[in-house]
Amino acid sequence: YGFETSEGFISDVTDKILPQIEDWQNRPLDEVYPILYIDAIHYSVRDNGVIRKLAAYVILGINTEGKKEVLSITVGDNESSKYWLSVLNELKNRGVKDILIICADGLSGIKEAIAAAFPKTEYPRCIVHQVRNTLKYVPDKDRKAFASDLKTIYHASDEEKARLALDRVTEKWTAKYPNSMKRWYDNWDAITPIFKFSPDVGKVIYTTNAIESLNSTYR
């Protein structure tokens, strides 16, 4: 950024803000959160002269008043069910008793941790990631039409209609893109929880804009 600073200055600033960060990270939370989003931001960090990748895991909650609240930011490099169980248990220690829905995707071990810490919580597959993975290898000329057809699946009013839409989309595109819909069938049990809710609630669940826009400000 065009300027330099000393290690001593950085240490002084760190010493002053660390207690505030710890107070924030340990503050009491609400008892109930309808929805939690969990996502990772990856950074390059210098550690003893070596550059390595670390992930900051951001937990964004939607409270019972519909307001967004960052509950926690933790840094780690070892995703596992044990790690996520400790993160979720820390939320419980801060007062959280119930979470209706947790939206997270691609985080190793989190499904098992949710089942252990909050066994009644729904954990649907992230639809946005599902769609992105499907369209990843689809050329531009077909992407818009394919994406529009995929919407008929997750915009369906119930699971039965969604499954019919899935079969129709697969029949339409499988000759041209043979493996494009395989993950939808493989992940179907993890996708279907969104159909337990109204379309308006379902849209909130499968839209990750809330946490993605937040994480973009951290970058």
What is each residue range found by the language model?
Residues 3-7, 12, 16-103, 108, ...:
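RNase H-like nuclease fold core
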Residues 11-14, 111, 147, 166, ...:
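Hydrophobic face of alpha-helices
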Residues 32, 141-157:
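A polyampholytic, Gly/Pro-enriched intrinsically disordered region
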Residues 139-140, 198:
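Generic structural signal for alpha-helix starts
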Residues 8, 101, 129, 179-182:
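Short, solvent-exposed positions on alpha-helices
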Residues 156-219:
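Acidic/histidine-rich catalytic cores and adjacent linkers
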Residues 119-136:
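Inter-helix linker motif
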